[in-house]
Amino acid sequence: MKEIIAKLADFKDLSSAEMTDVIERIVTGQVAESQIAALLLGLKMKGETIEERTALAQVMRGHAKQIPTTIRTAMDNCGTGGDKSFSFNISTTAAFVLAGGGIKMAKHGNRSISSKSGSADVLEALGINLDLDATSLGKVFEQTGIVFLFAKNMHPAMKYIMPARLSLGIPTIMNLTGPLIHPMNLETQLLGTSRPDMLESTAEVLKNMGRKRAVVVSGPDGLDEAGLHGRTQYALLENGQISLHSFLPSDIGMKEIPLEAIRGGNAKENAEILLSVLQNQASPYLETTVLNAGLGFYANGKSDSIEEGIALARQVIASGAAYEKLKQLQEYQK
């Protein structure tokens, strides 16, 4: 371990094999907290490579709890969080729209990072059981086509890393890793990040993790979702190739909405916002959900363009199919 830390101190990259070995030792309890903190800090100071991020994600995913399911076309739309936007639960709300549109949604998420309510908090407020065992979660997914996987329960190996992260108190490679280590073998993914400078590299990691198609998105002002208050940037992974794109609301036929109009509240308040959107009540929350669900349909390949995805999202919500998915999850994941 000392050799690894010394290498990072000299601003030298770790090989995939070196990173794999050190993370394996960490997640099996063989490395001291102080050394883990030094590793995280060294990687941050040097700058994390695609190879290092991929190796970390592959090891962490290998130690995740496995969800038994016959479904092989799962999708997630989890973001990194930490964007300090204090928005409502955009991706969680959009997940029900995507599921209502026929996509098998395995929503991976946690409690709040930068807002008052993370995906786990708002779903708990809606009566969703966060603590079902893996077999039960697999059954929920088979029965409903949507399931929520509480990251804290899915990744027991995180307990070895968390104390070092907390002691550092700064963003590290781990902040970028959560959406990459989904317990299932996802086919497609929409991943939000507050770091527009990492769109392409994150798409490369998703490619290395086996995604067939994906969109990595960063909204205006560092929002880790698509936004209607400025230019949204995204990387598209398609047919093994990665391309960079951006759009303004007017480019996709939508009106600009200020960030202040989509502020959220606590878990109970955000649950009420989620319900209002799924019940098709006109609001900035509805428009923002439609945008992100539309981008999700495009990321999945269900639509051929973002505009087509937006139209599909409106149709799914208006039909009641998205709200029906929430009711199914409340019935089966309880």
UniProtKB/Swiss-Prot annotation:
Manner of cofactor binding, per the entry note: Binds 2 magnesium ions per monomer.
Residues binding anthranilate 2, per UniProt: 165
The keyword Transmembrane belongs to this UniProt entry's keyword annotation: no
Keyword Repeat: no
EC number: 2.4.2.18
Residues annotated as binding anthranilate 1: 79, 110
Binding locations of 5-phospho-alpha-D-ribose 1-diphosphate: 79, 82-83, 87, 89-92, 107-115, 119
Subunit structure: Homodimer.
Entry superkingdom: Bacteria
Protein's name according to its UniProt entry: Anthranilate phosphoribosyltransferase
Pathway: Amino-acid biosynthesis; L-tryptophan biosynthesis; L-tryptophan from chorismate: step 2/5
Cofactor: Mg(2+)
Reactions it catalyzes: N-(5-phospho-beta-D-ribosyl)anthranilate + diphosphate = 5-phospho-alpha-D-ribose 1-diphosphate + anthranilate
Function as written in the Swiss-Prot or TrEMBL entry: Catalyzes the transfer of the phosphoribosyl group of 5-phosphorylribose-1-pyrophosphate (PRPP) to anthranilate to yield N-(5'-phosphoribosyl)-anthranilate (PRA).
An example molecular function term from Gene Ontology annotations: anthranilate phosphoribosyltransferase activity
Keywords: Amino-acid biosynthesis, Aromatic amino acid biosynthesis, Glycosyltransferase, Magnesium, Metal-binding, Transferase, Tryptophan biosynthesis
GO cellular component: cytosol
GO biological process: L-tryptophan biosynthetic process
Gene3D superfamilies, per the entry: Nucleoside phosphorylase/phosphoribosyltransferase catalytic domain, Transferase, Pyrimidine Nucleoside Phosphorylase, Chain C
Top class in the EC scheme: transferase
